[in-house]
Amino acid sequence: SHDNDGGLVLICNSGTYHGAGNQGSAVQYNVSINDAIRPRATRSGIFSANIHIAGPCKNTLVQRNLLHVNPKTEPFIDRSIITSDSWDGYADSTVFRENVFFVPQESEIRLNRSTRNTFDGNYYLGNIKGRPEDPNGRNASDYYNQCISKDPSGFNSLSFLFDTVIIGDGSAVLKAVNRDTIHRFFEMMKEE
């Protein structure tokens, strides 16, 4: 995803709904470039987390995603990488594993009253307030710096992760993450 006002993903569950809810969701192998850039107010104010977990979601896995945040164009634009908040309840047992969080400006992780969050082996590349305990977390990556050295915006420098897909008669063309390449990318991140 790129240039999405609302961020990469919304994982949600209304706490007032009495059905099965949102249990066991997985968000993995996504690439987000310059998302979470909403410049206008929503009903809850200026808000646009890259990863937003709303309500009592259970056993969510957020693994091996690349979030490349570019500088926000206005000082009032939300700078949260992750926000877990209430929708008549809070998330429980969310695992964040081996994600890359690249931020050129101070950003924040807001877990609020969510419970039993696990962070393991994530890359915190930049100044991130509210960083949770992550025993295998890293603050630097020479490999990632090398990847983006020619284009810090990420658009061209991370293009090797994508395939061009032509839809139908060619009236639509899109970029899709190449499965093998994104797997290799995360293996290279671990090898340094």
Residue ranges and their predicted role:
Residues 84, 104-110, 161-162, 170-174:
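Active-site rim elements
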Residues 3-12, 20, 36-49, 55, ...:
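Short glycine/acidic-rich loop motifs that flank beta-strands on beta-rich extracellular proteins
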Residues 132-192:
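Surface beta-loop-beta hairpin patches that serve as ligand-binding interfaces in beta-rich domains
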Residues 100, 108, 143-146:
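A structural motif corresponding to the C-terminal lobe/cap of the Radical SAM core domain
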Residues 1-7, 20-38, 58-71, 92-103, ...:
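Right-handed parallel beta-helix
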Residues 86-89, 146:
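Glycan-recognition and catalytic regions of carbohydrate-active enzymes
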Residues 17-22, 53, 87:
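Alpha-helix capping and helix-loop boundary segments enriched in small/acidic/polar residues
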